């Protein structure tokens, strides 16, 4: 069967757009961990004149850490096109007090990173976080396809520390309007380590549109009791709980306020 040249060109263009939106998102997504807990995070930038970067993750992940610092797994692109893992320590507390901004109601935290990172990193513009108007315009809803980037059970895609890409669908209805229900269900198997991972779809001009953040999984717990044994069995339901991006936006704005918690200043060399 012969395929018309214009169809071939269209398919090539579509493939390029898909690669672009996913690559832009993965370049801004990083593992965040300490000896006690591992999660996923991503970097957002606000419009000028704000030059800081905003690290987004689930608050329960940061609350589970034990020290005043955590490790952000960065990646350095080498001249031959390969990547090298670069673990970078960031402050998350000062004298035991949190440095992150948190939402009043939701499990999301944002750290404002004012100091430059040791290697160039990808970031996602604040405008890519979908508010209610953007969701309405996109016409996504029940069974719409979505993508996630996470570190399930701390697993990395390769030695450079890239996250794992997966796909699912929106599994609950209605998605809108935003109101008392700040989250929705997604049909993909969630694991520990996924929390803080971006949930996204293709946006305008081949750019990613973030429609939420993974923060929980669902499972069925069963208690087994007999005369000589008592144990619990956890059955995964193959569902993740996703916080709407609107509430990530609100938390970033909290982190950007002058009175928000600030990390300690670096000592002069």
Predicted regions and their residues:
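Bacterial N-terminal signal peptides that target proteins for export
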Residues: 1-7
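Protease-domain processing segments flanking chymotrypsin-fold serine proteases, especially trypsin-like
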Residues: 12-52, 266-269
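Serine endopeptidase catalytic core focused on the charge-relay Asp
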Residues: 26-38, 47, 63-179, 187-188, ...
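Residues located in well-ordered beta-strands
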Residues: 40-42, 169, 198
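Cytochrome P450 catalytic-core helices
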Residues: 57
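Histidine-centered active-site/metal-ligand motif
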Residues: 60
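Catalytic nucleophile loop of clan PA
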Residues: 185-214
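C-terminal cap/linker of serine protease catalytic domains
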Residues: 209-269
């Amino acid at each position: 069967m012969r395929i018309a040249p214009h169809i071939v060109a269209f398919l090539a263009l579509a493939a390029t757009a898909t690669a672009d939106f996913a690559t832009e998102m993965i370049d801004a997504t990083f593992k965040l961990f300490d000896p006690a807990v591992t999660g996923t995070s991503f970097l957002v930038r606000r419009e000028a004149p704000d030059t800081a970067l905003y690290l987004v993750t689930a608050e329960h992940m940061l609350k589970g850490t034990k020290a005043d610092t955590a490790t952000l797994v960065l990646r350095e692109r080498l001249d031959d096109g390969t990547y090298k893992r670069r673990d970078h320590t960031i402050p998350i507390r000062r004298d035991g007090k949190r440095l992150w901004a948190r939402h009043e109601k939701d499990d999301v935290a944002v750290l404002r990173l004012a100091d430059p990172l040791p290697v160039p990193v990808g970031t996602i513009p604040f405008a890519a976080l979908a508010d209610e108007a953007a969701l309405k315009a996109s016409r996504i809803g029940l069974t719409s396809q979505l993508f996630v980037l996470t570190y399930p059970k701390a697993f990395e895609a390769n030695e450079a520390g890239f996250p794992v890409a997966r796909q699912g669908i929106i599994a609950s209805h209605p998605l809108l309007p935003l109101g008392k229900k700040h989250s929705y269900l997604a049909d993909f198997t969630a694991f520990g380590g996924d929390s803080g991972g971006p949930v996204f779809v293709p946006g305008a001009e081949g750019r990613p549109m973030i429609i939420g953040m993974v923060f929980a999984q669902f499972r069925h717990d069963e208690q087994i009791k007999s005369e000589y044994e008592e144990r619990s069995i956890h059955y995964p339901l193959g569902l993740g709980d996703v916080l709407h991006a609107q509430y990530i936006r609100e938390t970033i704005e909290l982190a950007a306020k002058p009175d928000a918690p600030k990390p300690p200043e670096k000592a002069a060399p």
